[in-house]
Amino acid sequence: MREYKIAAIPADGIGPEVIAAGLQVLEALEKRSGDFSIHTETFDWGSDYYKKNGVMMPADGLEQLKKFDAIFFGAVGAPDVPDHITLWGLRLPICQGFDQYANVRPTKVLPGITPPLRNCGPGDLDWVIVRENSEGEYSGHGGRAHKGLPEEVGTEVAIFTRVGVTRIMRYAFKLAQARPRKLLTVVTKSNAQRHGMVMWDEIAAEVSKEFPDVTWDKMLVDAMTVRMTLKPQSLDTIVATNLHADILSDLAGALAGSLGVAPTANIDPERRFPSMFEPIHGSAFDITGKGIANPVATFWTAAQMLEHLGEKDAATRLMSAVERVTEAGILTPDVGGTADTQQVTDAVCEAIAGSNILNMAAVG
């Protein structure tokens, strides 16, 4: 029996709702597979913890998390806590402290979900966005001077290192190489940002020589938004900076139908530390407690987590079950359905328990 220790951090807003749904689905997979078990410990860190303790997580938070095989994260952010405190107090310290430098965000149109793009269905939009997750625009460097005075100045410094760019570029090329189309698009803004972004272009050209079977091209980030919208079939694997990929992946989720179906994995490819898996969507306080949060993104990131742990059959079974459920029209309101979170979760669990899930071809 293979055993895994998972740290669950539901955090804020709808985070606890979707993480509860994800844990229910993981339990269903355990029962269906019968050859692995997941032991979960839940941490109450987040905005409520901050209001009580003045910090988003304890000082030894990272040390507590080191013993786990993976981290299952909900969402962070609250209306009465500044966003920079919630982000820099919890999620970013985990990503940077554990050197989770590869943020991997798959996007595709799931069967049964109608995307906003005309003539775009399952198979037409099937991307993976690789986001540099350790430096760049979110390096945290900069400052403010003369605060409150007319001459106040604020600086936000983007840092790009050769080692950081090279390793994310190599990761993206390897991922593209493993996908059927072997196609990579490198996104920068090197016409206007003539230092760090030009270095990105140069390193991409250098690394590409290691992958002669991968076809690659370059796009400026503004032009990339147009291409994603008008020619989604022309894209496959995409790599971009911390900020650019953050923005593009939200656009990708919307183009696929909803951020409620968009997952993300914060990966330490060298496996020195636990990697973290989360839905892209935020804490969504406007629907918190209503029971209508879309759990599909959390199920998808749970599949990413299972694959990272080596449980590829379980990951495939989970995504097959999800696609059967969406195809059947069991959908939450954000994607045009009337089902609630629990109904979608129960349907996925029932699909997992059904026979021959692995042998059923996923639609799309």
Curated annotation (Swiss-Prot):
Pathway membership: Carbohydrate acid metabolism; tartrate degradation; 2-hydroxy-3-oxosuccinate from L-tartrate: step 1/1; Carbohydrate acid metabolism; tartrate degradation; 2-hydroxy-3-oxosuccinate from meso-tartrate: step 1/1; Carbohydrate acid metabolism; tartrate degradation; D-glycerate from L-tartrate: step 1/1
- Please report what switches on or represses expression of this protein: By tartrate.
Q: One GO cellular component term, please give it.
A: cytoplasm
Ordered alphabetically, the record's keywords are: Cytoplasm, Lyase, Manganese, Metal-binding, NAD, Oxidoreductase, Plasmid
Which Pfam families does this entry report, sorted A to Z?
A: Iso_dh (PF00180)
Subcellular location, principal: cytoplasm
EC number(s) stated in the UniProt entry for this protein: 1.1.1.93, 4.1.1.73, 1.1.1.83
User: Per the annotation, how and in what number is the cofactor bound?
Assistant: Binds 1 Mg(2+) or Mn(2+) ion per subunit.
* Binding site residues for Mn(2+): 222, 246, 250
Q: Which cofactor does it need?
A: Mg(2+); Mn(2+); K(+)
Bilayer-spanning residue ranges: none
- GO terms assigned for molecular function: D-malate dehydrogenase (decarboxylating) (NAD+) activity; magnesium ion binding; NAD binding; tartrate decarboxylase activity; tartrate dehydrogenase activity
From the UniProt record, list the reaction(s) this protein catalyses. tartrate + NAD(+) = 2-hydroxy-3-oxosuccinate + NADH + H(+); (2R,3S)-tartrate + NAD(+) = 2-hydroxy-3-oxosuccinate + NADH + H(+); (2R,3R)-tartrate + NAD(+) = 2-hydroxy-3-oxosuccinate + NADH + H(+); (2R,3R)-tartrate + H(+) = (R)-glycerate + CO2
Which InterPro entries would you find in this protein's record? Answer: ICDH/IPMDH, IsoCit/isopropylmalate_DH_CS, IsoPropMal-DH-like_dom, TTC_DH
- Which compartment or compartments is the protein found in? Cytoplasm
Instruction: State the similarity comment.
Output: Belongs to the isocitrate and isopropylmalate dehydrogenases family.
Please give the name of this protein.
Probable tartrate dehydrogenase/decarboxylase TtuC
Gene source species = Agrobacterium vitis (Rhizobium vitis)
Q: What taxonomic classification does the UniProt entry list for its organism?
A: Bacteria, Pseudomonadati, Pseudomonadota, Alphaproteobacteria, Hyphomicrobiales
